[in-house]
From Swiss-Prot:
It is found in: Endoplasmic reticulum membrane. One of its GO terms (molecular function) is zinc ion binding. Pfam families: Zn_ribbon_10. Residues 1-39, 90-344 are cytoplasmic. GO terms for cellular component: endoplasmic reticulum membrane; endoplasmic reticulum tubular network; membrane; synapse. InterPro entries: Lnp, Lunapark_Znf. The gene is lnp-1. Plays a role in tubular endoplasmic reticulum network formation and maintenance. May be involved in central nervous system development. Has a presynaptic role in neurotransmission. Likely to operate in synaptogenesis by regulating vesicular transport or localization. Required for correct localization of rab-3 and snb-1. Keywords: Coiled coil, Endoplasmic reticulum, Membrane, Metal-binding, Transmembrane, Transmembrane helix, Zinc, Zinc-finger. Residues 327-344 have a biased composition (Basic and acidic residues). A zinc finger (C4-type) spans 239-264. Residues 136-155, 171-192, 275-344 are annotated as: Disordered. This is Endoplasmic reticulum junction formation protein lunapark-1.
């Protein structure tokens, strides 16, 4: 007859009760651990106080040879009492912890069953409200641990790559062990890998550009401030597709730089075209030789090249002539011409 008059509870009410019990069990576990440590602390302090009182009473009551034996017996007995009491206290609180943990696991399984029941029985709007209220907490509590594991593995891989590239040739190679456990595959990650472009698949394990900049000192920061050469005075190269940072450039060169994104491979064109300098011919030298060391223009075909006259009878006089001083006198030229005519 009791079942006829009993009222069935809604899944939302049951879920609320189960969630409250789960929070209560978690608080109880924290209280049990705190009680365990505090009980051991007070137990140790009580044993030390009792042992010190017994030692003082023994030292004042008994004579010299007897009080030594009694003191040794008290120390041995106190040690046995401390170890035995510690074992009993730890066993008691371990039993309480196991029982509370089992109740917590049962409550969590009951919660999952109720959530599945809500998905199957209630309407979409009511089920969505209940799931948004209770299911987000569990997912938010599980995802950070998985993300932290993935981030930790990625950091280990980056540390190994950095140690390999920065290592000097005279140093020994020391490689940090990387865990060989496979990363848990998810459908979202597999779908993203299927939708990746060939450039992204080829550069999925690419390493950043080396070398890494050393850490700036106080002197470097002062010089950067006065010379306007620090990171604050430079423009960042940001990809227009994935908004990834691809290094920095000087403000004067920023509008004319085109770069390819390290993450997605998109070619970011320069915002401006560089200035084109006019092509100018270099000036001509005195003997048809340009200042850049090249020969001058070729004379036309009809024009005969001018052949300079060579002196058939070079002088053997070692005295410097007038031509060496920069000018030739007319009498010397006439004398040379007459000498050539007589010989011919």
């Amino acid at each position: 007859m009791g079942n006829l008059f009993s009222r069935t509870k809604s899944p939302a009410t049951e879920l609320e009760r189960v969630v409250l019990s789960i929070e209560d069990f978690k608080k109880r576990l924290q209280t049990i651990s705190a009680s365990n440590s505090s009980t051991l602390y007070y137990y140790y302090m009580g044993v030390i106080i009792i042992l010190s009182i017994a030692m003082a009473h023994t030292w004042l009551r008994f004579d010299d040879p007897t009080k030594t034996y009694v003191a040794c017996a008290l120390v041995f007995g106190a040690t046995v009492i401390v170890l035995t009491g510690r074992y009993i206290i730890n066993c008691f609180f371990a039993w309480r912890t196991n029982r509370t943990t089992q109740k917590l696991e049962n409550a969590i399984t009951q919660k999952t069953v109720l959530l599945d029941l809500v998905k199957e029985t209630l309407k979409f709007k009511e089920a969505k409200e209940i799931l948004d209220r209770y299911e987000e907490k569990t997912e938010a509590g599980n995802t950070p641990t998985e993300n932290s594991k993935l981030i930790h593995q990625q950091k280990q891989q980056n540390e190994t790559l950095v140690s390999k590239t920065i290592m000097k040739p005279d140093q020994k190679r020391v490689e940090t062990p990387v865990s060989q456990k496979p990363v848990p595959s998810k459908p979202g990650i597999a779908f993203d890998s299927m939708n990746m472009t060939p450039y992204q698949q080829r550069n999925s394990n690419a390493t950043p550009v080396r070398p890494f900049l050393r850490q700036s000192t106080a002197l470097d920061r002062i010089l950067d401030y006065f010379m306007s050469d620090g990171p604050n005075c430079r423009n960042a190269l940001i990809c227009s597709i994935c908004h990834t940072h691809n290094g920095m450039s000087v403000p004067a060169e920023y509008p004319f730089i085109s770069f390819r994104c390290f993450e997605c491979g998109h070619l970011n064109a320069a915002k401006k075209m560089g200035p084109h300098l006019p092509i100018t011919r270099p000036p001509m030298g005195p003997k048809g030789i340009q200042h850049n060391g090249r020969a001058g223009p070729v004379p036309p075909k009809n024009q005969q090249p001018v052949v300079p006259m060579e002196n058939p009878n070079p002088s053997t006089d070692l005295t410097p002539s007038a031509s060496q001083h920069g000018s030739d006198s007319e009498p010397e030229k006439n004398a040379d011409e007459t000498a050539v005519v007589e010989k011919s």
